């Protein structure tokens, strides 16, 4: 029984709050039950696609007017944001393939022209290898595969070469930061996600150039994390790339670990390398055994010690929501369904999903929402793999709540608090690259994205599957 919902309080104010919470939960539960079999017409799908297109155009117009050539738009102050000393065009690169997918040809043309005329990686700055890889390297590779302009590939190769020194550690696992001009590295305390979530991008670079150095470096790194797994087949949160020893044994599927698991499975799909499939299957079995808490609201994922399996935390949040889609995509639709029930509960329990909440106490532990895509991502996979209409209804609720609560006059703003709905001055590039893309794909015809031909990266950039 969840604390603070069903318990009777003497305090009248608390009683009213509990009544409102219970009423809200019952309301959304009734809606969800009714929507399982409710029709969702082709016209309704098209209307939702049009809403997403309009949202993308609105956000792009704000970027064009107030942040053209910058990394991001600050939507409240209407100012440009730079990640480093010089813009790396985060938003245009993340947005290009989304615009192409949505059929927004004018916007795609504008993003392409900006990238090809202004992008230059000769920057006197050290950068975070993980973020630059998943946003920029992936975006440029997809742009090349979609558009065919060789300058996209030239830029990708240049960036890949500037990032390669990160792998020059005693173990081969990359440092977190590398200087784009000097190759100097720093921060040897890394994590599985930032180590492993380079495989698709660097592997693809090898396939496109014929130079295996990128693939080999990335594979050595991700497989070393796998080799360092515990006897329970789990990995921890932090590892020293100089010694190969774990410095944090906290295990879960959230930040710092999440996309490591994702890339093991997707790298197998992309390249056909069975080593990745073996590693994923080993981990996935352990995750289901040690990390799932089954509740009446769905299956949540908790935190444990990687060595003992002892539960050390019961928080769940926006980032963890990806695992429902990954489970279903990997063939376990039932586990995916149960986790997605928890995901949707988390979204509707509050106005929008919080960054993190304690699913036992049913209270928020981190109240912000930064336009994250993972819940929509899992909703997309669940609908595509099951055809169940309830996922269209879930998608509709989530997309419309983002539009209702996050939209302003020049774009979309993150929320400081999902309960008060106070906005904050951020619209990151992944809103274009992932959130809008998944929002559209939920309702778009299946032919829009063919699972047999492409695999989506963690930043939702579609990579063409390599011929086996």
Predicted regions and their residues:
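Bacterial Sec-dependent N-terminal signal peptides
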Residues: 1-36
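Glycan-recognition and catalytic cores of secretory/periplasmic carbohydrate-active enzymes
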Residues: 35-468
